[in-house]
Each structure stands twice: as C-alpha cells, then as structure tokens.
Amino acid sequence: MTEKPNHAEAMASTTAGDTGRASDAGRNEGQPDPRKASIETDADYAALDSTARAVLDFWFGEPGTTGFGQPSARWFKCDDAFDTTIRERFGATLAAARRGEHDSWQGTPLGALALIVVLDQFSRNTCRDAAQAFAADAKALEVARRLVESHGDRHLPTAEHRAFAYLPFEHAESLEAQRESVRLFEALARETGQTGRGSYVDYAHRHAVIIERFGRFPHRNIALGRVSTEEELAFLREPGSSF
C-alpha cells in the first residue's frame, strides 16, 4: 500500500503465492454461519452512505461478485494509472474525510472501514513519496481504534476487510500501536491460517521491530523532511527496509 510501499507491498507475495492459506473449511472454523453473514452483509451495505459504499466496492469488490473480499495485486504495487483513478474518483472524498466531513460513516463497522480506507490507503495512493501520504494517519488510527474497541471489526465480512481495518495500527510510529497491530494480526492469522512470509502477521512483526529499534520508520524521513541518523542510513541500505 507508497509507503505505498507500506504494508501493502508486503502482501504482494501473499497475493501472488498465498503462503499457508487455510482451506475453506479451516478458514470458516469458529466463524459465523456464512449464509447468515451474507444476509447481514447485504443489509449493512444497503444502509451505507452512497460514497462509503462506492469506496468499499472499488477497494474490495461488490458483494456477491467472484472477487469480493479477495486479495488484489493492485493494492500493493506502485501503479500510476491506479493512483490516478483514485485521485480522480475519490480525491474530493479524501479531502472531505480529512476535514471530518465523513465522520458520520463511523456509525457502522462497514462505514468506519470505508473511512479508514480513504484516510489510510487513498492518502498513500494519491500522495506517494510526499508528507501528505501520512497526513491522515492519526485520524485513521483514531477511527480504527474505535472500531476495534467496539468489536465492530468482528462484524466485517471477510479477513481482507478486517486486515485493512487494522493497518492504521501498523502504520503508526508508536510502539503501543505496533503492539496492538501484532495482537490483531496474530488473532486474524489464527483464524485464517495465513502465517508465512509475506502474510499480514509477518509484516506486522516487521513493522513493529523497526519501531522498537528506531521509534520511527526511517524510509519516511525524506518525505517528512527528517534527518536520518547514521544507523538509519545503514538500515535503509538493507534489502526490505522500505517495505
């Protein structure tokens, strides 16, 4: 996701090879009856603000379609055409969300997720390699924290929906948020069986290690006008240091 080489690039390998993905039976173990979940999802989608619905349909696919809630390679790679599409379709939505004009979306779990996608993902797509890519991170984290505290994340329709609800924790330059990211992605991994290299939980741990070491993400330093330390510069020369 620029920093979209952020976690998002991380999951490209999972999308391509899907390491350790559980069987359908295992994936649903301990989960709600899928038929009931489908009915609930339809009702929740019907109640959404039309713009929030457009965001979710664009990012995760429409309910009932083959690709709904399935990993998408476009999430995780730098693609100028895809970024332009987001900028043209949702640039005004992002600006409004940053001003708090879509805070009412938080009334439902799906609405909160739509707001997170706009603030956390669309910012990165539309402002790659610039400080504005991270300008909405604090607000996205607030929304994600409320969603998790209310257990609303448990009502999201698929594992991919839940993963994007958790990414603001992973993107935060905060050790407390990183620990919560690891906790959330470990719980999700136990349910899905996705634990290998390139999985969400793998990248949650990698992000947390960097914050434990540096207290910030060194690969953001240039965009944010920060001076890198010698240790950070050495780290940035290592493979995989920028996700």
Predicted regions and their residues:
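Intrinsically disordered, low-complexity activation-like regions
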Residues: 2-4, 29-130, 134-243
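N-terminal intrinsically disordered, low-complexity tails
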Residues: 8-32
